[in-house]
A protein has these predicted regions:
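N-terminal subdomain
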Residues: 1-130
Length: 130
């Protein structure tokens, strides 16, 4: 289902994901011991982000609703982790991808700490796409 979403989204949305997939090795570098981080459910992955991202639980609900029965070989959690990144929120600055991208660009890599579980789920999901 996530693969279908990538095809159906406007080009800028697909580029956003494809750019991140191409940089997945780069994304791992700032996360200490990335390979030892467990893959957890989306709900567990966003728990450390509840105080950092406005409306994140509503975003998760919407993402999971859109990814109810994935047909792309991903689990609902995996597909929804990608959908969460793709969702546009209003105001746009509250969109999950904007917040995450700002954290990834930040000089202070300590800010990545609460994002580690989500990044692990997200990157492992992207790597499963055909």
């Amino acid at each position: 289902m996530a693969a279908r979403f990538l095809r159906d989204f406007e080009p800028q949305h697909a580029r956003r994901i494809l750019d991140k997939l191409a940089l997945s090795q780069e994304m791992r570098k700032p996360v200490e011991n990335f390979d030892s981080i467990p893959v957890v459910s989306l709900e567990e992955a966003i728990e450390p982000l509840v105080s950092l991202v406005t409306n994140i639980k509503e975003m998760i609900s919407k993402a999971k609703e859109k990814c109810d029965k994935p047909k792309d070989g991903l689990t609902t959690n995996e597909s929804a982790s990608i959908m969460l990144y793709l969702l546009e929120w209003k105001p746009r600055e509250n969109s999950f991808y904007i917040i995450l991208n700002n954290i990834l660009r930040a000089e202070d890599k300590e800010k990545l700490q609460p994002w580690q579980l989500y990044l692990k789920l997200f990157i492992s999901s992207l790597e499963k796409l055909p």
